[in-house]
């Protein structure tokens, strides 16, 4: 019996050992599953945070691009304002310049009138020099092809001496300030 008892004890010890191993394996598996669950939760949290980070980076890039565009637009507007700062003054002076040119077309009959016209021509020349320093230039019209960006056609005639769509006569001078037309030339155009 002692052998039976010993065998029974061995069987019981083996069973006890097996139960302990199974319990340890179950605990280990639970711990592994718990760790895997935590890893999965952490990975999910990392993915969410990465998505938020990407979204914020995109917003930042858009804001930076918008700001750069704003700076560029502002700079261009400032340059244009500086470039064309004298446009209002020039526009106001042009009618006086037109009157000078009309007055200079009068034929002088006396020495006194000739002297007066010479003085007026000098004043007109000084005005033109000052305007040219600001970037004002007269638009060439007579003999040029009609350009609606530079010329305003007020009359059309048929003249065999000129080609089609050629400016025959300038009725009022046009002017440009740098590259901007501030007053188109009023012209007579051949059909």
Swiss-Prot record:
Keywords: Chaperone, Cytoplasm, Stress response. It is found in: Cytoplasm. GO terms for cellular component: cytoplasm. Gene3D superfamilies: 3.90.20.20, Head domain of nucleotide exchange factor GrpE. Participates actively in the response to hyperosmotic and heat shock by preventing the aggregation of stress-denatured proteins, in association with DnaK and GrpE. It is the nucleotide exchange factor for DnaK and may function as a thermosensor. Unfolded proteins bind initially to DnaJ; upon interaction with the DnaJ-bound protein, DnaK hydrolyzes its bound ATP, resulting in the formation of a stable complex. GrpE releases ADP from DnaK; ATP binding to DnaK triggers the release of the substrate protein, thus completing the reaction cycle. HAMAP family: GrpE. Belongs to the GrpE family. This is Protein GrpE.
